[in-house]
């Protein structure tokens, strides 16, 4: 039997590998998606490490720019399309309509028990920390009048910041949906009780 998943390409089953029902076992804090966690951190760390390493080792601006920008672009794609839905059960995208207006689209799992708290923490902390790091690097380069490096830092900050903004909006939308479902359930229960008394 399949559990509900809002992500059509990712059904999850009720049974684990041993054939035992997963409901009878307590939820572990161990990551359920270690490969996703690895790649969620890998591209972020590579981009920042190469950027910092280029200050101490003469790698060259062009090579550093290419490696850091590509790592940040890969990180943007992996975070937006893979790790967000696997680690925190959220997915977002932005559609531009024919009239030129933007439309943010959000998806989230309805059953928050599917989200592992440890994985959620491993998702949010790096998203916030690396966005803040690129912002700090940008400020340092701005005041240090290092405008070539500022270009790299702004590109990386914008990529990281777009994911941060998208996931914050997505998380707010998910909370709003849960609140709306709870309110409609309560109202429905009260109305049914009132009708049954009449």
Curated annotation (Swiss-Prot):
Region (Disordered): 1-29
Membrane-spanning ranges: 48-68, 132-152, 154-174
A GO cellular-component term linked to this record: Golgi membrane
Membrane topology: Multi-pass membrane protein
GO biological process, one term: vesicle-mediated transport
Pfam families membership: DUF846
Protein name, entry field: Uncharacterized Golgi apparatus membrane protein-like protein 1
Organism: Dictyostelium discoideum (Social amoeba)
